[in-house]
């Protein structure tokens, strides 16, 4: 009996950690793609505010697996994702930023797969470029999506 309680606690702790990994994502909407009695598969739209650049929000759409495993955070979501980043306010930098930096990441399975959003600076065009891709412990996915946010003329991108 005590052993079963420990297993339940472990599963709940892992599920809580998986849910907490997407703390910066704000779900904007979703559509069901496959009905299941225990929760449908969906395409979700999430917003991520760039933590180093005020006034820039990235919108990521990706598949999320339903069912019991999906509800517990144990399902492996497909690696496909699309990204669109936009200027949503006055662009202001909180400090110098790296030439290239992994600015967001969210687990797509309980242990193995992570969705990344990387920001790169195109100094020549005064533009922030955002790339999304997924990886896993053994191999990543070549599927990716890219978007760019031009920074207004006169605003210098402070690069470390």
Task: Give the location of each predicted region.
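Short, surface-exposed loop and linker segments with low hydrophobicity and enrichment for Pro/Ser/Thr
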Residues: 9, 39, 48-53, 118-125
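N-terminal secretory signal peptides
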Residues: 26-84
